[in-house]
């Protein structure tokens, strides 16, 4: 008689055979967003009403820039993984491939734009592209 754990019985099930890894990735990013969202709200609340020079100086400090960057990166990776599952469930064929490509490109473009903007604010005139 063999003893099979519930995890072993569930492993490999599903059409993609990677549901466990995806579930853990989504869970970890959701927990990270649970911590980062209130911190990001505090950062944004403190930035409201600042002049442009004060805002550049504020995001030039490490804590606000780091919290903002982490929030955008973790949030967009969570978005990419979530939209991938939604697209896999509701689209077929070429439309599925196009939608996945669009959502991944969009997510990484938002991450790149946010990190570039934070680097420009934090480093000032040093970063020129």
From Swiss-Prot:
Residues 1-22, 88-97 are cytoplasmic. Keywords: Cell inner membrane, Cell membrane, Electron transport, Heme, Iron, Membrane, Metal-binding, Transmembrane, Transmembrane helix, Transport, Tricarboxylic acid cycle. CDD domains: SQR_TypeC_SdhD_like (cd03495). It is found in: Cell inner membrane. It is a multi-pass membrane protein. GO terms for biological process: tricarboxylic acid cycle. Disulfide bonds: none annotated. Its cofactor is heme. GO terms for molecular function: heme binding; metal ion binding. GO terms for cellular component: plasma membrane. Pathway: Carbohydrate metabolism; tricarboxylic acid cycle. The keyword Translocase does not apply. Heme binds at residue 78. A ubiquinone binds at residue 90. The chain crosses the membrane at residues 23-43, 66-87, 98-122. The keyword Ribosomal protein does not apply. Residues 44-65 are periplasmic. Membrane-anchoring subunit of succinate dehydrogenase (SDH). NCBIfam families: succ_dehyd_anc. Part of an enzyme complex containing four subunits: a flavoprotein, an iron-sulfur protein, plus two membrane-anchoring proteins, SdhC and SdhD. This is Succinate dehydrogenase hydrophobic membrane anchor subunit.
């Amino acid at each position: 008689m063999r003893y099979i754990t519930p995890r072993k019985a569930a492993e490999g099930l599903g059409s993609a055979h990677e549901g466990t890894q995806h579930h853990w990735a989504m869970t970890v990013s959701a927990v990270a967003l649970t911590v980062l969202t209130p911190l990001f709200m505090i950062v944004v609340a403190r930035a409201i009403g600042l002049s442009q020079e004060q805002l550049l100086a504020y995001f030039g400090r490490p804590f606000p820039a780091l919290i903002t960057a982490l929030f955008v990166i973790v949030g967009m990776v969570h978005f990419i993984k979530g939209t991938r599952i939604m697209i896999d469930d509701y689209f077929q064929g070429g439309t599925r491939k196009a939608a996945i490509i669009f959502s991944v490109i969009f997510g990484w473009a938002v991450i790149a734009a946010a990190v570039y903007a934070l680097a420009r604010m934090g480093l000032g005139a040093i970063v020129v592209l």
